[in-house]
Structure formats: C-alpha cells, structure tokens
Amino acid sequence: MRQFDFMGKRRLAFTTSAVMLLIALVSLAVQQLSLGLDFTGGTLVEVSYHTAPSLDTVRQTLEAAGFQDISVQTFGTADEILIRLQQAFDPNVGQQVTDLLRAGGDQVTLVRAEFVGAQVGEQLRDQSGLGMLVALGVVMLYVAFRFQYKFAVGAIVALIHDVIIVLGAFSLFQIEFDLTVLAAVLAVIGYSLNDTIIVYDRIRENIRLSRIDDMPAIFNDAINQTLSRTLATSGTTILVLLALLVLGGDMIHNFAIALLIGVGVGTFSSIYVASALLLPLKLQRTDLIPAPKENEDAEELP
Amino acid sequence: MLNRYPLWKYLLILLVLAVGLVYSLPNLFPADPAVQISPASGGENLSESQLERVQSALADADIPLKSTERGANSVLLRLDSASDQMRARGVVDGLLDDDHVVAVNLAESTPSWLRDLAASPMTLGLDLRGGVHFLLEVDMDAAVTQRLEVNASAMRETLRSERIRYRNTEIDGRTVSMDFMNAEDRDEAKSLISRDFPDFQYADAEADRGARLSMTLSDQAVDEIQDYAINQNLTTLRNRVNELGVAEPLVQRQGPNRIVVELPGVQDTAAAKRVVGATANLEFRLEARPDTPEQETETLQFRSSPRTAELMRDVIITGDSVSSATRSFDENGRPQVNIDLDGTGGTLMNRATRSNIGRNMAVVFIEHKTNDRTVMKDGKPEVVRDPYTERGIISLATIQSALGNSFRITGLDSPTEAAELSLLLRSGSLAAPIYFVQERTIGPSLGQDNIDRGILSVQIGLLLVVAFMLLRYKAFGLIANVALGVNLVLVIAAMSMLGATLTLPGIAGIVLTLGMAVDANVLIFERIREELRTGLSVQQAIHAGYERAFTSIVDANLTTLLVALILFSIGTGPVKGFAVTLSLGILTSMFTALMVTRAMVNLTVGGKPLKKLWI
C-alpha cells in the first residue's frame, strides 16, 4: 500500500490553517454572522384568503419580490395564512405583502401585521455559549485521562479550529445562520471529535508497539493505516450531505453546507491540527508508556 | 471456539430488537384533530350529562364526531378535519363555563394494544407538523400599577422609619399620590423620597385638610417598566413551557405587547394552556394588630371557607423571591409545597419574622383572571375583557420562631394545585398579568414541498450509503446495512419512548448518527482486512478486527456522547433536542455495530473453516 508523507508537509498545512483561521476571524469581526429569523425576529403578517391558496405559491410570490427567510403556515383554517418574514418591521409591510398576494388575482384581506421578537432568547444564547465551553472542558479532561494531556490540547485546538472556520465561512459568504445551522455546527463538533479520536487511538497503539522514536514516521504510519477508513467514512458522509444539498430544498440547504465544510475541515484537522500539533508539543514515547522502573535496572546488573 | 456467541447474547439482541419494533410502531399511525376538555385548576371532570349536552350541541352544529374518549382527567373529542376542529372548539367553549378548559389538540391514534404497552408516537415538530398556537396579551397597565404598588410600599416604609406621618396613598394610572398633615411634612417627604426614586416627576397639590404630593412616572420610566415586563414574561413563559416538558416549543414576542407560544403536535394542550396562562403568585403578609390604622390594613377572605382576616397592606415578600419549590405531602397526607427563598428574600423574611414572633402570618394566593363579555360594536360582535384580581388566604399561622430560607406552605386544595403552584413558583412569576387573545392550530412552518424534498433527500442519502457499503464490503456490507436498519428502528423507538420531538434538523441528526454507525462498521471491516493482510486466518482476523477496533469505537463514541450529555444538561430548546437525538443515536449505533453485526457475522461465518472472506 502506498505511504503518504503527511507529516513532511505539516508546515504548509499549518500555514493553510493559520490563513483560514485569520480570514474567518477577520470576517467574523468585521461583518459578523448573517443571523436568520430565529435569532433576529422580523415581521409577522396574518392574511385571510377567500379561498384556500397554495402555500408554495404564496412563498414563491414573496420570494420573487425579494423578501427573505419566509415561513408560510396555515393558521386555524386553510384560508387563513400566517407569514413570518425576516424584515425589519415597518407599518407598510403588511399592505405591501397583501398587495403582492392580490396581484395573483386572489381575494386577500390583511388581518394584522406586527413585529415578532427572536425565537432564541438572550438567556438561551448565553446558556448555549456556556454549554459549549463546559463541553470543551470535559472533553479535554476525558482525552487527558484516556490518552495524555498533550492529546487533549491537540483535540481541543482542532475542535476550535473547525468551529471557527465553519462560522467564518458562513460569515464570509453571508450565508444565513439559523437554528438548523447551529445544529449542524454542533454535529460538526461531534464528527470532528470522532475523527480525531480514531486517529489518536491508532497513534497511541503504534507508539506502544513500535521500537523507534521517530514520531513523524509513527504518525505517518498511523494516518496511512486509518486513511482508508477516513476516506470511506468521510466519503459516505459527504455522499449523504451532497444528496441533502442538491435535493433537500431551502431548509436543509444551509445545514448541508455547514456540515460539508465541517466534515472537510474536520478530516483535515484530525491529521494536520490534532496530530501534527503533537510534534511541537514534543510528544514522546514516555508520555504513553511509564518510564522503566528500578526493577528493570536491577535485572541488567551483573 | 472463536467467533461464537453464547445463546443468551443472541436472545438479548432479539429481545432488544422486538422491543424496538413494538415501540417504533405507533409512528405509522397518523394523529386525529381533536378537542380536549379538562377541568380548570382543582375542578371536577366533565359530568356525563354535560358530555351529552356537548355531543348534542355538536350534532346540532352539524359537526361529525369521530369518537369520544374519557380519560382520567379529561375528555377527548376526535374530529375529521381541522376546520371541524375550530368550529367544534367554538361550540364547546361557548357551552361550558369557566370550570373547564377547552383546547384544540392533535390526538394520537395508536391502537389500544400498543397503548397498553405505553407505546406512543414521536411528536413531529412545529416545522414538520405544526401544532397549537396561543397568542397572549400582556396587561401593560397592570405592569405599571404593580410597580407603583411596590414603590409605594417602599416609600411608606421609608417615611415610617423617618417618622414622617402620612395619611393616605392612592395609585391612579401612572401617578402615586400621598396625603400629609401639612406642607412641611410633605416637603420633607419629597426630599427624602426623591433621592431614592429619581424616575418620578414630583408635584405639590392641595388637598382638603393638609397637603398632597403627587408623583408621576416619566414616559421613559413607563417604557422601561413595560419593556421589562414583557421580557420578564417571555423568560417566565419559556421556563414554564420547558418545565412542562414540551420539546421544541416556540415562544416569541409579537408586536409591542403580545407573546406567541406555539407547542408542537400531540400534547396535553389543556394542561399547557392552564400552566402557560396561569398568573398565580403568592404574597406573605403579617396579620394586622387590633391597633393598626385602617389605611394600612386590608380584609381578605380565606379560599376554603367564608372566614376573613385583617391583614397588613405591606407585603413581606412575594413569590418572586422563591428560588425553588417542590411539592410533597405532610404527615396527614395533605399536599404541601416546600419553598426555598433566594438570598434577599430570606433576609427579608428573617427580619420580618424575628421581630414578630407570636403574631400571625398569612400566605395569600393571588390570581389574575378575566371576564369575557361579547358586546356589539359598530354592528360587529367584539369580545371585551374585564380583568380582575382574586386574592385569597391559603393559610394563616402563628410565627413560632424566626423563619429562614426554607419553609413549607400547607392549606392547598389538591395535589394538582400543589404541583402547579410549585411549578409556577419555580419558573418565576409573571411581571404582568397575561390574557389569551387567540388560540389556533397552526400548520407546519416548512412548506409541504420542502418537507417532501427534505425527506426524499434523506432517503436518497441513505440509499447511497447502503449502495456504497455493498460495493465496498460485499457480504459484510450487507450485514452492515441490516445493522443500519436495526439502528434506525432503535433510534425511532427510543425517541418515541422518551417523548422526543422530531424536527427537520433532528432528522438530519439521525442521518448523521447513522453515518457514525457506518463509521464503526467501516473501522471494524478495515481492521479485519488489515489483519487478513498480515496473514492471520479468517477466524482470527475477524476476532482481532472486532477486538482492536473496539477501543477506537468506544473512545470516539464516548467522547461524543459526553459532549451530547453536556449540551443536554445545559442547553435549552433546539440545542437540547439535538443533544437527545445525538445521544440516542450514539448509544444505538454502538450497540448495533458492536453487538448486532458481530452476532450476524458469528451466525453466518463464525467457526466455519473458511479460506477466504467476502469483504
């Protein structure tokens, strides 16, 4: 089987990571995330039709008129429609929407138009942020306990790296960030961690088995041995995500984008962030195998 | 012998599979639109004669009833369509008085043999199925009045401690006025109060027999109070809905003074309505002494008997100071609520009780209610709400010793009332009373087109994975695919048993955990291939492959599970929902990858003298 020299190219990879992180952070600082209706709130318009309309037509009409992030629901009966738009409230929106819908020849009356607040309260936002930090801390402890603290540092840096790059991509291209995308980011954390631990596990196994101290070579072996698995898993996941992206429609679209970026970056970071970072952290065989004790010395004595 | 399972392991796997199948079955039966009638707090269930009246009224209105079910605490009327449901709700609500809560509901139609096993379907989220929509209005005037009452009480306290005599306080709109014996007292009071309350505009006025100070809230202060009230109410409602165990609800502000609460699918909507709309709070007050001046006292009635008691107007603390509350039973089996106060509340309570040992203290139950009347306005019927406040003493007991941070309240009507009161105290009180303005069923927030496309894409994604596994691992791929199917059934069963709510992101989460389940199999199969290459025999390679992949799989899954558990315990709403799906998915995928595929491999090739593996 062909062996790739992954570790030999780590300087190039570190530079790539650093550049991506920088772009992501600058974009997040300058133009923030383009938050969706769930986070910002918007305008709610309730209209009453004479005969029940097709919800998809309503949605398409409004989309064509340039409204964003639209949700259209029946409200009580089939001819009463509730529309939520991500649009700063002004007193004319209701009339504007009604006029647009009337243009299709339907009899539409405006029942009410009001602003709606964010679905995600500040409390939730703060709690979720805290939750993430605690989760990172516990993961670090667990990895330090199961492996060694240098592994823990690598795993956490890789996780933060992945999350920042996914968020950065959403900020850079101003793709809408809503609760569904938040779920995707959480999934990226799960995926990336899974991937990292699998590579780590092989590294640990190889360090314990091998007789050489050449860490880059051991890492290369471990990564090459898990490569077919990594490609198979990322491959199937990407297959599913491509299906979601192409066929899934508007609502799943951004979710799939977040995960596609996440899976790509996550696979990259398991090799080049989580594992390669172990080299500057000076991981040694003795970190995983306790140093030989006196009784071994005793055996060597004449 | 290598690669053989003992019989009990096969039986265990079969048992888990059977349980999984049974509990995932209810998801195949669609829910009916229904109207649920349940008694208002502490009342009686609908009587047989009332039910007959309801049924005949529905028949008169030409609304066909699919079936009627009488539950332990409610009556469920199943209907054919959503429009029948709306009309039926109107008819039933008009017929019954305030003793009953009438709510629209989506009732599950699980066959009874499954229901006997406590099997029920997953709830579909607001995005996929829709649910019930409550529109609540916050009484902004009451928010201001309540704040003024608290301020007036604090002002009186200040004046008393400075020994300035006042005669009367009055609250009207956004103005508090106080009467004094003379202008000097008033001026002194003004300089004293204005230091503590900069939000008021102070004005002197003449009054018969003395001087009057009128204090009016500035516009900005009123805005702040109202903003605070609605935000506080939003938080409280979110807490309450979460306490109810409703997964994936929506609580958001609408317009300047309204709040929307949407609850997905099959829920006990009547209970939800009662708890969401409840405005109950508590006040702790001292009983008045015989020599207390009349303007400082108020006469209140007991809730359970026509007795009355004379109480001080000043409130020691309200339910807002409660940090936690639980329900339990006292020695005699009567319901009680155990209360813990927060720091300030505890200090206030301690100070008040310490200096008043031997006096009586009352616990007052407050509820804001409305009377709806329909009046004709411009030829159209319009509902007018007259808000009123009910105050009743639930207990009056002698203070035996100084009270601290925790104590208990007795004298409640029923265990249900104790449970709801403790829930309300826990989730925080409302800063202003709220009223139901509208109640509707609401359709899915995703268009049918979007839902169809989403589900189609998930199916195609799964098919691709299945095809990939077959191509790459041949016979072992088939085994992995069967395990994948088992995994899907188990996740759905577990989510149904936990009463989790399925949303579109949730479906995507399931697909992701299926991906992780495939990953576990990939790890094992790759390892077996590797072991075969190093020259191990078929049986040894299978054994070593499972053995060596085991630590990788367990480590990777446990770390992810840790993250999911933390997200679950700290996160709320959608984060929590995602965490549930992820945790369940990880557990089932570990089970299927490590046990189910192993069992199948053992059954098919285990122990047989094979030269070559189809992998």
Predicted regions and their residues:
Chain A
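A structural signal for conserved, well-ordered secondary-structure elements
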Residues: 1-302
